[in-house]
Amino acid sequence: METSIQTYVNPLSDAGFKALLCDPANKPVLIGMLNAFLPPDRMVEDLEYATTEIPGLTLAGKASRVDLRCTDTRGRSFIVEVQRSPQPNFFRRCVYYASRIYALGARRGDGQRYDILPVYLVALLDRGFGFRRDPSEWEGRYVSRYTFREKETGQVEDETISIIFVELDRFGKEEFGECAGAAEEWCWMLKNMWRLQPGAAEYPGFEGMLAAGEIAGFSKEKRAKYDADMITERDMYNILETAKKEGEAKGREAGLAEGEAKGKTEVAKNMLASGMPEEQVMAMTGLTAEQLAALK
């Protein structure tokens, strides 16, 4: 959770992510982050921000939003999602998002040629997500890449959909100087930027990111938006914590599972009443569209 006395934003918080990576003025920062996790032959040279709203994306048929969406000069689509706590079926949700964007690309195709450009989804994960990880194979690994490939040979026939998970909770290097390569440096900075103090140390290659994320340097309008997002984020955090405690109390009285379910229901009701989009409520509570509909 961000504080009012820190110098830099937290890129993994909703308010910090919007202020740093969703601002077109900070496009070079976003390009640097994407290139740190993309394969060397898939580098981004330039990009344009695209609408985050995707018509008909939810199972309820309503428009929804991803955290960030952009297109590069070659027409490839990129989605960036930040997830700070585990949620049910997150892997499937990412596949669904990327598939929908890929399907929308067919509209630009020529007749039945299906000349559809690739889609990349990069998910920044701040907590353990329960992925099946064999310690003998995943020791020291925190970036995983998924795509369509032939099972026996591993051959990729064509570039279609790629999903990249950056599991920041698995990244354990404590000092910036311990990092080897851009991917590790970016992982360290994403986790620790909000704790840094100006002039305490030098971080080669991240001068632009630090300048863009310095709260005192925000314009009056941007600072007002950032503060409003911070308040909303704290309110949602307090709602979740309160509901969790209420759910635990009810769980002691009527069974833990039932209590947790009631807690989630109360959280969802409060979020919907505050005007939060249904997709965001589902993401934060784990409830389905049908369950939300029953609360109205």
Where are these regions (language model features)?
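Short, charged alpha-helical interaction segments and adjacent helix-coil junctions
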Residues: E2-Q6, F78-Q83, E184-K296
